[in-house]
Amino acid sequence: GNKQDKLKRKLEGKNLVTQYSTILGSRAPKPHMRMPYPSITPVHREPKAQTFIKAMWGACLEAEQIVKQLTPHLYERQIQLFEDVKKEWKFGTMYTSSISNFNIAAAFHRDTGNIVGTVNIILTKRNNANGGCLNVPDYNVTFEQADNSMLVYPAWRNVHGVTPIKPIAENGYRNS
């Protein structure tokens, strides 16, 4: 909203955290939603999003190379699991999609749409914000995700969530 709306919400003690989320790449078929075929996500048709999409594609490729260098066994398994995925549905070389969450906390869930055996790469940018940590109850652990960090995690395997994000200064954020 505008400055007046923000001031009103602040005086009322309401949440002032701006949140955005978008999925890049492809979507799996969802026959129950009258979409029996895979498709590219709608953001790809938005001219203003093209620079963002290219930047995310580049970040994806760079992260894949880090996985290849540090954990070649994970990289090779991921490549094998994606052998049957057509190139047109891939985002990078070993994923079908990428999600960008700006100040988004997530309730507990399991990524049931992921291919069993795969890993997710979570790249985090943050500034003047607390929270936004990955909580995995099965491991009794919460992963603090520092600025410029990368976490590799099999999100299909366990229930997990993201803790609330609280800016500690004006324009504070957490993006992953």
State the predicted function of each range:
Residues 1-118, 126, 142-143, 160-176:
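Fe(II)/2-oxoglutarate oxygenase catalytic core
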Residues 100, 125, 134, 150-153:
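Generic hydrophobic secondary-structure signal
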Residues 118-120, 131, 146-150, 175:
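Active-site lining segments that contact anionic ligands and/or coordinate catalytic metals
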Residues 123, 143-158:
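Conserved metal-binding segment of the jelly-roll/cupin
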Residues 124-146:
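A short beta-strand-loop-beta hairpin characteristic of the jelly-roll/cupin
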Residues 134-138, 147-149, 156, 163-167:
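Short coil/turn segments at secondary-structure boundaries
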